[in-house]
């Protein structure tokens, strides 16, 4: 603890300010956020003056968290003062400071050694102002004395003033982008006043930056960044020898060159586990391959360097490539800086073609020529001769095709269900990795519980059967089930769960920011119903298209089989804010027809003699699209023409028509007015469940009629 550096400026802050209620978030208001940098002193100074306006503000503001990297930085505290009216209280007590390991990325198996100093302030009250300042001394030695950073001019809480002051050595080149500075007393100053709180809409693409910022950098070109990186990826003699010996093993065990390349890729991906020890120099510099081989772990840098050197020993041209999984195609809009990159992959050139290989993807299938290319936009090739970014041409063989076949020999015995799911490309990679992380029994339990959402009385007929052709990267899972009482109510409703998970709506529908959409995506779901009677259903088909996707749906019949086919293919990964309304309209159109109700005439509900068996007529079969679309009614072939009618889901009858309620009492009121189809209004055995459907939380009340025993489910959602 010591006073602020002499080169800093003390900025006035009016602690008597009384912000309007609409200018407060989380119970706090920032009067000043000040940041000053001296490049020659390798020191950054920070000061925050924050007003606490409510008990929740006390909770949010009374614990200070200051981050630093002890491998090359030193945290220096200057002062912590609580201002209460005209009274200023020194609140900096050494006994109230705790230093803990930060490790924000521990769940991703990345450990960078950063620390957080926590200061627990005592006796903070609403109306107080907390004024605290600190400095970080030291610069990352890997940058070789060069400076690059990005300054925020936005904030999550409202701020009266945000200020950045940069003392820059005379004669050194400096580039900036985002806002022009003022020059005050030989320093560059960027400032924003009366800054509203930043509202980030949900579902934005990773590349979209909603905040205002200024990028500053001493790097003058991408060539300079590439040369900096090239110096990091230097091989020592021990690594060269050990990798050469490893390459000889692959040559001895695999005859063809393609097989050797595939073996090398899979060795790095599968046999070297992903773990990032990114402390000190290894925040940017990879470990030597011999270290990676000895530890059998590594992060993206370590794995890529090992893979590149191994491929070179096998006679393949390969280079490390820096990419930004966040900025993607927007990387080219930034000024050159090493800090823009968050991942490293390998550029592989073979037979005149360029491929991109990610060494961190375990269980990946395919060969060099067929593996999916990550869509990271642009890459900086780590090579001394690199002068510009290289565009990555993304390729995808990914698809998922779910085929569900229901066979009902009659409507009293259990219905047979076979589910066959075919995964290709990165969908196969993901499924292969998922299966590798669990037992077959666990996977079987996961699957049957997913299917039980729509078919509660489902039983497995053995364990799932998995066939994996890793070379072609095609993985097929086959499941068999029996479903009891599927037709108990005389009909059954079906939802394409796989498709609907990709058709969610954002919470913020009136948008100022773009909306992300899963891409690349190709999902198909085919459902065939083999029934106990003829089902001459009218053939229908529909297509819904938007800039982001193409959706197709069709209904067909052949003898006793009804087939529903649906597919969704993405076209791009984002929707501009101005196009979101049209996108949501298209989604609503799909939701209006995405599910089906089946009511074959032979599957009558279990009711008393007042029987509704003539409801559809002998041999009638109905496929009804949700939300009151036209119903395709077909009869067994007979002289009279098929009738056409309309069936709508009554309020509360299905998830899509869930009743909106504000209080629990309203649920009771709705239930009291709802009669069974037999006319009775007495029920027993009520059961309450919670579920989530189409981004909505549902309450489902299931009960049985006291007269006929028929089950009734009523769906509610909160207002």
Q: Model features per residue range: what roles?
A:
Residues 1-628:
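A sensor for short, sequence-defined functional sites
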Residues 639-719:
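Cysteine-centric segments in proteins
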Residues 2, 207, 636-638, 652:
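Compositionally biased, intrinsically disordered/low-complexity regions enriched for serine, proline
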Residues 628-642:
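C-terminal membrane-anchoring or membrane-association module
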Residues 31, 617, 631-632, 658, ...:
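Acidic/proline-rich low-complexity IDRs
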Residues 303, 620-627, 633, 679-681, ...:
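General secretory precursor processing signal
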Residues 256, 419, 634-636, 702:
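Short, intrinsically disordered low-complexity segments
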């Amino acid at each position: 603890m010591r006073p602020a550096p002499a080169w800093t400026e003390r900025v006035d802050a009016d602690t008597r300010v009384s912000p309007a209620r609409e200018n407060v978030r989380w119970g706090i208001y920032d009067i000043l956020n000040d940041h000053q940098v001296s490049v020659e002193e390798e020191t950054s100074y920070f000061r925050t003056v924050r007003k606490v306006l409510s008990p929740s503000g006390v909770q949010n503001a009374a614990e200070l968290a200051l981050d630093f990297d002890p491998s090359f930085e030193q945290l220096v505290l200057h002062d912590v003062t609580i201002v209460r009216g005209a009274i200023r209280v020194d609140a900096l007590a050494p006994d109230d400071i705790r230093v803990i390991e930060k490790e924000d990325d521990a769940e991703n198996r990345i450990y960078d050694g950063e620390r957080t100093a926590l200061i627990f302030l005592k006796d903070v009250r609403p109306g107080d102002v907390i004024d605290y300042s600190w400095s970080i001394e030291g610069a990352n030695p890997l940058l070789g004395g060069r400076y690059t950073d990005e300054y925020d001019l936005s904030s999550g809480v409202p701020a009266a003033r945000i200020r950045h002051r940069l003392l820059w050595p005379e004669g050194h080149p400096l580039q900036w982008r985002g806002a022009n500075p003022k020059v005050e007393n030989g320093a560059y100053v960027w400032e924003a006043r009366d800054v509203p709180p930043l509202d980030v809409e949900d579902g934005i693409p990773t590349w979209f930056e909603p905040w205002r910022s200024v990028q500053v950098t001493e790097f003058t070109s991408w060539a300079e960044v590439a040369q900096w990186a090239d110096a990091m990826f230097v091989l020592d003699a021990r690594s060269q020898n050990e990798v050469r010996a490893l390459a000889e093993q692959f040559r001895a065990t695999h005859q063809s060159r393609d097989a050797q390349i595939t073996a090398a890729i899979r060795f790095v991906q599968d046999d070297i586990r992903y773990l990032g020890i990114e402390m000190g120099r290894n925040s940017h510099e990879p470990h030597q391959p011999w270290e990676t081989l000895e530890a059998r772990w590594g992060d993206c840098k370590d794995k890529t360097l090992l893979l590149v050197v191994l491929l070179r020993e096998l006679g393949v041209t390969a280079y490390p490539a820096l990419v930004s999984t966040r900025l993607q195609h927007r990387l080219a809009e930034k000024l050159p800086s090493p800090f823009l990159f968050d991942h490293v992959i390998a550029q592989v050139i073979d037979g005149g073609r360029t491929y991109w290989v990610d060494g961190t993807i375990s269980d990946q299938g395919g060969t060099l020529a067929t593996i999916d290319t990550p869509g990271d936009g642009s890459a900086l090739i780590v090579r001394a001769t690199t002068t510009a970014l290289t565009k990555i041409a993304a390729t995808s063989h990914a698809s998922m095709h779910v085929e569900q076949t229901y066979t009902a020999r009659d409507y009293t015995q259990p219905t047979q269900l076979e589910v066959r799911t075919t995964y290709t490309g990165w969908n196969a990679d993901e499924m292969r990795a998922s299966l590798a992380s669990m037992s077959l029994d666990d996977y079987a339990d996961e699957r049957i519980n997913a299917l039980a959402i729509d078919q509660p009385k489902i039983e497995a007929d053995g364990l799932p059967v998995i066939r994996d052709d890793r070379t072609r990267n095609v993985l097929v899972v086959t499941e068999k089930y029996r479903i009891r009482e599927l037709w108990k109510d005389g009909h059954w409703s079906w939802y394409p769960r796989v498709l609907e998970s990709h058709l969610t709506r954002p919470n913020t529908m009136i948008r100022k920011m773009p909306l992300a959409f899963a891409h690349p995506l190709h999902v198909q779901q085919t459902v065939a119903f083999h029934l106990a009677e003829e089902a001459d259903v009218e053939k229908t088909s529909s297509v819904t298209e938007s800039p982001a996707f193409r959706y197709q749906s069709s209904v067909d019949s052949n003898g006793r089989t009804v087939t529903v086919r649906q597919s969704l293919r993405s076209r791009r990964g984002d929707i501009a804010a101005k196009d979101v309304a049209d996108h949501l309209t298209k989604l609503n159109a799909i939701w209006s027809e995405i599910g089906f109700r089946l009511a074959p005439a032979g599957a009558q509900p279990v009711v008393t003699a007042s029987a509704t068996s003539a409801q559809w007529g002998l041999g009638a079969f109905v496929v009804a699209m949700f939300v009151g679309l036209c119903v395709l009614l077909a009869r067994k072939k007979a002289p009279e023409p098929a009738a056409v009618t309309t069936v709508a889901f009554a309020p509360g009858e299905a998830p899509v028509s869930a009743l909106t309620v504000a209080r629990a009492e309203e649920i009771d009121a709705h239930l009291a007015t709802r009669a069974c189809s037999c006319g009775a209004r007495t029920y027993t055995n009520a059961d309450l469940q919670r579920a989530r459907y189409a981004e909505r939380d549902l309450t489902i009340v299931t009960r049985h009629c006291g007269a006929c025993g028929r089950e009734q489910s009523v769906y509610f959602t909160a207002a």
